[in-house]
């Protein structure tokens, strides 16, 4: 695994924090599906086994990369699709 891939995986595992249940305004069609938040790049939703979206938050300096389905460095993501990054 490349250093970049390992770093991305580490960022996802360590810094993605389950903050609370949420509603992204979208429905889950299958479990383990990921949805981006339309108003905040720091937030994404993971669909649980009951097809309910669970609000997750990326760590500092990262945002949700919907193409790769990981929290990624802000320079690597298109934040126009996922809204603004929350102030730190």
Swiss-Prot record:
Disulfide bonds, paired cysteine numbers: 58-71
InterPro entries reported for this sequence: Chitin-bd_dom, Chitin-bd_dom_sf
Expressing tissues: Expressed by the venom gland.
Residues of the signal peptide: 1-16
Alphabetical keyword list: Chitin-binding, Disulfide bond, Secreted, Signal, Toxin
Pfam annotation, one family: CBM_14
Domain of life: Eukaryota
Record-linked PROSITE patterns: CHIT_BIND_II
Ranges for domain Chitin-binding type-2: 25-81
Recorded GO CC terms: extracellular region
Localization annotation: Secreted
Record's comment on post-translational modification: Contains 3 disulfide bonds.
GO molecular function annotations of the record: chitin binding; toxin activity
Main localisation: secreted
Family: Belongs to the scoloptoxin-01 family.
Protein name: U-scoloptoxin(01)-Tl1a
């Amino acid at each position: 695994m490349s250093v970049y891939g390992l770093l991305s995986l580490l960022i996802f595992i360590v810094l993605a924090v389950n903050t609370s249940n949420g509603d992204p305004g979208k429905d889950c069609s299958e479990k383990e599906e990921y949805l981006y938040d339309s108003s905040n790049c720091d937030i994404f939703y993971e669909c649980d086994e009951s097809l309910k979206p669970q609000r997750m938050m990326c760590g500092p300096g990262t945002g949700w990369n919907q193409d790769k389905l990981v929290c990624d460095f802000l320079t690597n993501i298109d934040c126009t699709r996922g809204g603004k990054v929350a102030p730190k």
